[in-house]
Amino acid sequence: KKVTAITAQAGYAVDSSSKKVLFSRNPKMKFYPASTVKLLTALVVLDNMKLKDTIRVSRRASSVAPTKAGLTRGASYSVSDLLKVLLATSANDAGVALAEAASGSQERFALLMNKKARSLGCRNSNFTNPTGLPDKRQLTTAYDLYLITRAAFNNSFIASVMRQKNVTIAGSDAKPITLRNHNKLLWRMPEPCVLGKTGYTRSAGHCYAGLAIYDDGRVIVVILKSRNPYSDIRKILSKR
């Protein structure tokens, strides 16, 4: 089926069972990933830390640019809770706190991100921070992001977090933080169920890296530099 008017400048979608490529546009062209990099951040954290480990939030982490969860500076949170707000609600403060705890600094963490990406088969990407905040050197391709997304959704913890419409966490200060999942498809599309990481900056446009779950299979779908991401995802999935 020919799909018209997909606004994304790049994308890649694969049916996991048949391995059929449902959509491919500029799969090796480099784009800014925005917050879709948080899937890679989560994979690196899970390789290096335990979910029950606790992390004290630094001044640097608490004062990072939005989007953020509003973590309390000096309070401690579990890795599990920080990953929940990182993945479901795109919290940059959680991303910085996790990166600092896993490796000492965002710069050192970026080295781990690149190493992990290479191990997954990514050949045309460069990662410089755990949040996806704008950096001209942080680039990926739709195909590389597909490899990262596939690995992320194979992780049962990441997949379970992405299903949650709302997440609530509390740190050592006992102040609960409740936030909505940024992925509007959890509300808009009952079938298939589409779990996904959103991303947006002015330079990156709208990005999305997700998993569509059908009764009889799964599709990994990635788009970069879109003007209308949810419509694009719907149109790509209609090709199945």
Label each region the model flagged:
Residues 1-143, 147-156, 214-215:
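Active-site-adjacent loops and short helices of periplasmic peptidoglycan-processing enzymes
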